[in-house]
Structures are given as C-alpha cells and as structure tokens.
C-alpha cells in the first residue's frame, strides 16, 4: 500500500487490525553521467521499494530524495549533511512508532548515504524492528554508478534514458582488491576526479532485459530478508 493518498480512518483501521511493515526508500539527487537523469538513485530505489511493498503487503512511505552527494561536486548534486539525514530518519521512525508502526525497513539507494545510515543504525541498535539495507547488496553482481547495472535498471523502469550519450567510464577490470579499495576512498572525496565523466562502469551494452532480471532478483531477495527479520 502506498501511504500517499490514503485516508486517516482507513489507515488507522489497517494499523489496528494487523502489525504493519513500513518501508522508507532513501535516494539522492546527483549526476549520473551524460545519459542518466540526476534522479536515478531515487527512481531506482522507489521502484524496487514499490514492488517489494506489494509482495509483502507493506506500507510504502514517500521517498527521501535528498542524500549525501558532496563527492560529486563540481558535477551537479543536491546534498544534505550526514546529521540531517540521520535526524530526519529518526524523526520519521519516531512518528511511525507513535502511530502504531514499529516494524520499519529503510531501503537505501545511494552509496554516499552509508555513513549517515550506519550512524542512524547505531543509535537505534536497541530496536531490532528497525532495519537499514542497501538494495544493491541483494543482487549477485558488482554494483556501479551509471554503468551497466544502473543503466539496465533505468531502461527497465523509465523512458528517461539517453543511450546515445552513454560512454564507458572508470573500470576496475584487472585491478587488485587493494587497488580498488584505494580508488573507492578517493572516489568518496571526488568522484569526478576518479571517473572523469561521472560514470563508474560501462553502460554501453545495458539492456532493459537485464534490468528486469536484476530488479526481480533484488525484490525476491528482499522478501526473503523481510521474512527472516519480521
């Protein structure tokens, strides 16, 4: 159930009748190369959360579209402080609990949000019913930024993709784990310096078919995770 557009009496009745799982998608607004929209992270996590919520009959909250994206400057980004995102989630979860919903799953769609979400989790460690996950950890492939994975997913869910502008970005093929780890740390400080064009991976062979496969894999694994948690 999408909470937006619901009516108070119906919502309170549903909460009273059965324990609910609230789903909070968290994305970002930031550059995704010349071929994907700046809303890519939010678009993907919203779609995955929507499909997941239908599978478990959960309550889908509006996506938090603003994340921590300073590392993409001077390419375009709309970023908030780490403390801001953590406090916002704390307030939203507190309000949900006050209204009778204590089982809360936060689905993250942006790598740069991780530190803030980990901080939030530490503060909420006593509450086993509040869980933070990143959707890309539920697929059996290497994640990227505007590369094959994200571009394929966007082709599966959106018409707002300019494949004619897609170009290969920074790739880690042949690099050791230590080298990749070092590059990752550099990218967290300045993504444009590492990638050049804002792309991590190769989007040129992306397809909607692969995107649909990835989405199904992620959603099915999220359902399994939810069953184990709640």
What are these regions (language model features)?
Residues 1-103, 111-230:
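Extended, histidine- and acidic-residue-enriched regions that form the cofactor-binding/catalytic faces
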